[in-house]
């Protein structure tokens, strides 16, 4: 019994020292603070559906100027227009008036023949992003920090 108690004490001490050795090293990297590209825009910009529909009439390599609401005007060129599936058409627009930010917007055909839209405008050199949201039948661009949005 005496040896069992000594072996138990040694095992507990060994586990304690091993567990202490497993602590993670301190993180010395901090996220890079980037300037904001869309800080002159409001937090939420209402977008009429007609403006979103007009974007999809433009062809690849064409220049585009479209007002997405009263506070957001897009100027740039269509760099890609791809039918991802038979129900989803996606476009990439390089926005020259927003330091070559990329506007990716998709039109999804619903089963009843109506359309829904999703999208985002992002620049990897800046710390914010505009996300296109649909809420209660109304579309809006919402400004968020880029840390909160996934960028491929």
Language-model features and meaning:
Residues 2-10:
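Sec-dependent signal peptide recognition
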Residues 21-152:
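N-terminal prosegments of processed precursors
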């Amino acid at each position: 019994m005496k040896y069992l108690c000594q072996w138990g004490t040694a095992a507990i001490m060994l586990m304690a020292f091993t567990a202490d050795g497993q602590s993670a090293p301190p993180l010395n990297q901090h996220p890079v603070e980037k300037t904001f590209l869309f800080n002159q825009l409001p937090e939420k910009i209402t977008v009429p559906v007609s403006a979103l529909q007009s974007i999809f009439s433009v062809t690849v390599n064409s220049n585009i100027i479209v007002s997405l609401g009263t506070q957001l005007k897009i100027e740039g060129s269509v760099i890609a227009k791809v039918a991802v599936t038979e129900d989803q058409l996606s476009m990439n627009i390089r926005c020259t008036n927003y330091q070559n930010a990329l506007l990716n917007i998709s039109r999804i055909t619903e089963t009843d023949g109506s359309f829904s839209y999703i999208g985002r405008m992002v620049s990897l050199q800046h710390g914010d992003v505009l996300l296109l949201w649909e809420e209660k039948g109304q579309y809006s661009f919402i400004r968020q920090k880029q840390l909160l949005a996934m960028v491929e």
